Amino acid sequence: SPSSRTGYPRRQRICRVTPLAFSLWLASGMVHSVSAAGIVADHGAPGHQQPTIMQTASGIPQVNIQTPSAGGVSHNTYSQFDVGNQGVILNNAHNNVQTQLGGMVAGNPWLAKGEARIILNEVNSRNPSQLNGFVEVAGKKAQVVIANPAGISCDGCGFINANRATLTTGQPQMKNGSLTGFSVERGEIQITGKGMDASRTDYTDIIARSVKINAGIWAQDLKVTTGRNNVDIAHGQTEKKAADASSQPQVALDVSSLGGMYAGKIRLVGTETGVGVRNAGHIGAQAGAVTLTADGRIENSGSISAKTDVHLATTRDLHNSGSVYAGQDTQIQSDGAFTHTGSVASRRNTRIQTTRLTGSERSLLAAGVKDDGRLAEAGNLTVSTTGVLAAHGQVLSGGNMQLKGQGLDLSNSRIQGQHTGLDAGSGNLSTQNVQLSAGTLSARTAGHFSNNGGTINADTLQISAQSLSNHRGKLIQTGTGDFSLNLPGGVDNREGLLAANGAVRLDALSLDNRRGKVQAVQSGSLQVKTTGAVDNQQGSLTASRDVRLNAQALNNDNGLISAAAGTGRIKTQQAVSNTEGRMESAGRLGISAGSLNNHQGTVVSDGLSVTLDGA
């Protein structure tokens, strides 16, 4: 009876919607979800900028992008744009199309008038976008732009069927329906965890106030720009904004030891004054060049390499404790000081310009280095500083070498080159304890040249200095040409060796050759001329042919002066001392002096002439 009824019976289902029909309704826009895997359209944006967000039949988030403008830009605005591990599909196909992530995808009804050339995904949020999966363009290839001023984090992100991928914290700039570029004020992009795979994308852009790379980036053509800038859509022009009161990041681009860039070619630009670049990982261009410019300090403790060229430029200091290598040319420019404890090399030419260079004993500066580490027969090394150039490690060149600064300190280094030029300008030149081998060596300084303990071998030696110290050093010319030293100051050759196969001519203020050797070895003559004294105690002045000595005074005690196959001539204004010394010539020997002390000395010749004027 009606009074005994406790309620109405439950309604029975009279029909059901199959999954296939429901997916078709979603694809046609009849039904849509407001979010999928963290992707939410911004309902405060104009309607023509709100994409339709749904899922494919296989459960992959799908975005039916909005109708493109006349400029081919589909402008899509979100309040959240996070991509999960399963990825997301940006539907740029008017008709049904097969995708890698989601299989068959129904056509996008918003594209009745044509597909997009650029898919702009603009995020209005206080939170960074989390990109943890691939972004696939269904249908026609397009440039994918993800712009979130709050920042972007990529952990396993990547792109499929995109001809260009752009991650930016800049505000998109639109003009007459075209995307003209990005205005960057803030925001950081981080690459972490599983990194970023843009290897199937022609061009990859990362544009932000600062960038941290703690994982790998794989790309074909990678460009990273940091700082407060206006950057054009093609990432070809960057306009630096005037400084403001906003707090600066500590580092503009930071590549950790776990991070790396692996691309065909790489261009890195940091424009913010005083904010530098730090690389502890690997930056490698497998097909092209690596270019890094910064308006702040560059620190490299990792590796930077390129198939072609490497170009590093900074307006501040540069510190390299890692490795830099170019398959073609390496160029480094620093408006500050260059501190170098690692290696800088190239297969062809290496060029360095800086205000001051300091290279440790473990450092390497090289040009003409083959892949196996051996020197080729070509490749020039040029290092130029406006201040002191100090290089204490290996300095190697398969071809020519030019080291120029206001003072050169090459002590304890190993130097090898064909035509090697050392120019210390108005400063001093030091090759103390050096090991130097060259075809032609040109050493020039307006100051003092010190080769104490150093060994220099060259086919041709050309030395210009105020004075020379070769204490326990060796200056050896191995070619057949003449060796000339013309110095306004003195020569200190104590326990040292000055030698040449050809003639040796020494013109100086004085010569201290105690326990030293000055030799014209094979077929040359020796000529020594000083306005001061020559001290040859326990030393030797020898030539295979003639010997000519003209000095204020001569001390040859326990020393040797020998013209093995020629004549000898010794002329002094003051005394000649030959105590227990030896003077000899195969031909005639002439001695003209103020006085002569030959106590227990030996004078041997084929005709002796002695003139004493009593001075």
Residue ranges and their predicted role:
Residues 2-5, 24, 29, 34-36, ...:
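Compositionally biased regions
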Residues 3-5, 9-11, 16, 24-286, ...:
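Solvent-exposed adhesion/ligand-recognition segments of exported proteins
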Residues 11, 537, 572-573, 599:
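Intrinsically disordered, low-complexity regions enriched in polar/acidic and amide residues
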Residues 14, 51, 302, 313, ...:
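Compositionally biased, intrinsically disordered low-complexity segments enriched
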Residues 21:
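Beta-strand-enriched accessory nucleic-acid recognition/scaffold domains that flank the catalytic cores
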Residues 41, 55-57, 366, 446, ...:
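Intrinsically disordered, low-complexity segments enriched in small/polar and acidic residues
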Residues 65, 81, 109-111, 118-124, ...:
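Well-ordered beta-strand segments characteristic of repetitive beta-sheet solenoids
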Residues 79-81, 107-111, 129-137, 152-159, ...:
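Short, T/G/N/S-enriched strand-turn elements that build extracellular solenoid repeat scaffolds
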